[in-house]
């Protein structure tokens, strides 16, 4: 007799990321931005959005300190306002956003945001979600 395994919250997030990536990625976000994948690191409880920048945004030399800080604020504001990411924010996940150049392949930007950054107090423990 096979045992019944109830999928944990973390397992569900990892599976949903794999399914989303397989079904929708690469996904054009705008003319210069492509979402290449969503992944979830269970031990680190980190949800990663990996993007590829192209066109005028793919230039490595564009990303100076001031541009990096401005982009960080934009990405964080988008995270704070995101309704689709609400269940993951409520669970207190860390979000990683990484951007690569379509031209050089180099990593251009990388941001990590914790509940403290995006202003969310976890409403439940992920281990207890049924």
Task: Describe the residue ranges of each PLM region.
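Post-signal-peptide N-terminal segment of Sec-exported extracytoplasmic proteins
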Residues: 24-54, 112
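Alpha-helical transmembrane signal-anchor/signal-peptide segments
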Residues: 10-21
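C-terminal partner/receptor-binding element of secreted or periplasmic proteins
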Residues: 99-130
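Mature extracytoplasmic domains of secretory-pathway proteins
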Residues: 40-90
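Short glycine-rich, low-complexity/disordered patches
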Residues: 30-39, 81-103
